[in-house]
Amino acid sequence: MLKKTLAALALGSALLGAGQAMAADYVIDKEGQHAFVNFKISHLGYSWLYGTFRDFDGSFSFDAAKPEASKVKVNLKTASVDSNHAERDKHIRSADFLNVAKHPTATFESTGVKSTGQDTFDITGNLSLNGVTKPVVIAARFIGEGKDPWGGYRAGFEGGTKLKLKDFGIQKDLGPASQEVDLIISVEGVRQ
């Protein structure tokens, strides 16, 4: 009897552990202000101009034991750009930059994930911005996961990439120090 009980407990523990190692689906927690899509670009080579996008949503699946099976999808409203300066934001929304009247949404959808070290990954995917779709690689880092105080389960990541403005049809010349923009992404997802 004791052997059967121990065997059942061992099998149950193994199945429970296997279930925890399977991929889980998450929705990015934008509503709780636990996710950000920020950017920075050099201003004349003297300082950094920082900004954010306020309106976006997305989801991801993640399996720590098999990260190459992970997937990411994000949709962003380009008109939600905020650089803390109303006139500059109006210019960024214009045809000189994001052309939000013609291209109101930017999207990123992963095509592959590759482990690059302990808790680090390269997420390859297609970024559609300003009417142009190009492959990009986001260098990402797993921050952590666990239960939250409200009965849910969360996982968090940060990442970043550099984009050449001209690659996405942005022809406005900002000078030699401002040809690229850094995207800085921080997300916390709630498991579904």
From Swiss-Prot:
<feature type="signal peptide">
    <location>
        <begin position="1"/>
        <end position="23"/>
    </location>
</feature>
<dbReference type="Pfam" id="PF04264">
    <property type="entry name" value="YceI"/>
</dbReference>
<dbReference type="InterPro" id="IPR007372">
    <property type="entry name" value="Lipid/polyisoprenoid-bd_YceI"/>
</dbReference>
<keyword id="KW-0732">Signal</keyword>
<dbReference type="GO" id="GO:0042597">
    <property type="term" value="C:periplasmic space"/>
</dbReference>
<comment type="similarity">
    <text>Belongs to the UPF0312 family. Type 1 subfamily.</text>
</comment>
<dbReference type="InterPro" id="IPR036761">
    <property type="entry name" value="TTHA0802/YceI-like_sf"/>
</dbReference>
<protein>
    <recommendedName>
        <fullName>UPF0312 protein Avin_03250</fullName>
    </recommendedName>
</protein>
<dbReference type="InterPro" id="IPR023480">
    <property type="entry name" value="UPF0312/YceI"/>
</dbReference>
<keyword id="KW-0574">Periplasm</keyword>
